[in-house]
């Protein structure tokens, strides 16, 4: 499957409703501050410019700190040596967001007679969080687990990475890939059993296609301004740009926030949101991982909430958009990957990628025995 030389078209197996697309052409030209985003436009002109900038930078810095992992993880599989069971706060959180492994029987009981669709984040979910984003390699046993899941259920990778890059990590042609936080979606090869009958060509949907020149331009600007900050890296993910500060000294985080904010002053159609030790510069359109999940479900003909159980597993703030969609639809389960208590829209939790793999293997065994 060639993931690099496709044109931005939709070849839909089912009719895609205008309500789902949300009038994308008008949104592409519209500017508005999105929830969870920070922007330099639309402020009260009577307020001091410097004061506005300071408020923006401090708000972004607070978000950076709140999204930072509080424990040093073992790069082997995201494990650490502390005991969550001894932490009262963690125990209280687990009561609200219980283990998906311990609750597996309950999850599959609700799926009896229904179709399951599986959605997976990549970094921190299928691969460990590592200092160098280019080395977030998926293990062979995890790849085998995902491949087996895709044999029985429609399966998609929904990542902030570019679609091409996440495919290079996963290397499975039988999956759907939604890169750039769902702004770059491609179906698997047409011969795969979960591909729709009408999908004789590659399904490609890119709601932010018009932003490509702007993303390239802002990438160059960001590379230039953070080049003097030790540990800061910039990653062009095609329809969004990631500014990684995982390896930046905490004393320099405010400088990173300030420089990113200053760059975005020249790009009012872009916004910045925070992820796990990363700032994400994205187009200001009404599209996110939640919208991508809805689009994929409809494209697959799995939009019937009465007969479909979507399962979404992810570890980042951007995955909350997908968790929220599943809650609002009152259908399916969001599963947060975390070793620390977090505010979340997810129903269940898993500690790390090793537990994610165990859960995926559980799903496969359950399906084999239920056939």
From Swiss-Prot:
Pathway info: Glycan biosynthesis; trehalose biosynthesis
Up-regulation conditions: By cold, drought, salt stress and abscisic acid (ABA).
Keywords recorded for this protein, A-Z: Hydrolase, Stress response
Organs and tissues of expression: Expressed in roots and shoots.
Cofactor annotation: a divalent metal cation
Catalytic activity: alpha,alpha-trehalose 6-phosphate + H2O = alpha,alpha-trehalose + phosphate
Pfam families per the UniProt record, alphabetical: Trehalose_PPase
Alphabetical list of CDD domains matching this protein: HAD_TPP (cd01627)
PANTHER family, per the entry: TREHALOSE 6-PHOSPHATE PHOSPHATASE, TREHALOSE-PHOSPHATE PHOSPHATASE 1-RELATED
Similarity-based family: Belongs to the trehalose phosphatase family.
Its job: Removes the phosphate from trehalose 6-phosphate to produce free trehalose. Trehalose accumulation in plant improves abiotic stress tolerance.
The name this protein goes by in its record: Probable trehalose-phosphate phosphatase 1
Organism lineage: Eukaryota, Viridiplantae, Streptophyta, Embryophyta, Tracheophyta
């Amino acid at each position: 499957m060639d993931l690099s030389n496709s044109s931005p078209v939709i070849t839909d197996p089912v009719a895609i409703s205008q309500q789902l697309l949300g009038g994308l052409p008008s949104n592409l030209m519209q500017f508005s501050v999105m929830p969870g985003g920070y922007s330099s436009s639309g402020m009260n002109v009577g307020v001091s410019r410097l004061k506005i900038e300071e408020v923006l930078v401090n708000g972004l810095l607070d978000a950076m700190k709140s999204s930072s992992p509080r424990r040093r993880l073992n790069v082997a599989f995201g494990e650490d040596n502390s005991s969550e069971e001894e932490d009262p706060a963690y125990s209280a959180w687990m009561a609200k967001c219980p283990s998906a492994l311990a609750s597996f029987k309950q999850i599959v009981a609700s799926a009896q007679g229904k179709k399951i669709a599986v959605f997976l984040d990549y970094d921190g979910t299928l691969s460990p969080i590592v200092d160098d984003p280019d080395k977030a390699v998926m293990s062979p046993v995890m790849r085998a687990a995902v491949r087996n899941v895709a044999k029985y259920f429609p399966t998609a990778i929904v990542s902030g990475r570019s679609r091409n890059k996440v495919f290079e990590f996963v290397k499975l042609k039988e999956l759907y890939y939604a890169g750039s936080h769902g702004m770059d979606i491609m179906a698997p090869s047409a011969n795969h059993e979960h591909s729709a009958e009408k999908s004789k060509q590659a399904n490609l949907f890119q709601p932010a296609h018009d932003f490509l020149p702007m993303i390239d331009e802002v990438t160059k600007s960001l590379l230039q301004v953070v080049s003097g900050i030790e540990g800061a890296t910039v990653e062009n993910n095609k329809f969004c740009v990631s500014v990684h500060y995982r390896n930046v000294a905490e004393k320099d985080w405010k400088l990173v926030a300030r420089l990113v904010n200053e760059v975005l002053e020249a790009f009012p159609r872009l916004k910045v949101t925070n992820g796990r030790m990363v700032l994400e510069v994205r187009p200001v359109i009404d599209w996110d991982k939640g919208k991508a999940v809805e689009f994929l479900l409809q494209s697959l003909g799995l939009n019937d909430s009465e007969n479909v159980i979507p399962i979404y597993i992810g570890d980042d703030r951007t995955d909350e958009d997908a968790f929220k969609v599943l809650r609002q639809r009152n259908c399916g389960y969001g599963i947060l990957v975390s070793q620390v208590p977090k505010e979340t829209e997810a129903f269940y939790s898993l500690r790390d990628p090793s537990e994610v793999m165990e859960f995926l293997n559980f799903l496969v065994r359950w399906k084999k025995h239920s056939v």
